[in-house]
Amino acid sequence: MIIDIHGHYTTEPQAVFSFRDKQLAGLADAVRAPASADLGISDEALAKSVEPQLRFQKERGADLTIFSPRASGMAHHVGTEAISVQWTRVSNDLIHRICTLLPQSFVGVGQLPQFPGAPPAKIGRAHV
């Protein structure tokens, strides 16, 4: 078995970027913050979004990818503890869903809250 040990989710649906934009806009004006962390992304849309990664896996001869959120999206320099924790949950939930949908192709690795001093326990759970 060939395992790619460093894969990031770089083909997220637009709803992820829209959520993050609203989340960051809420820093200046709370009215603009997202009302919910439910992005409304179906399982089918998630599976379709990773088709490029699956194609790269096949082309490179890899069987499995250790899969994590996009590193640049963590933005440790932006926001508050609450925003960091919420973004961490949203990002990790997407990775978990993809790995649940495609367990033969992906094993998830989560991110931790990127706000200084935010305890990892704030993300509320761990999936094994």
Predicted regions and their residues:
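Helix-coil boundary/capping segments in enzymes
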Residues: 1-125
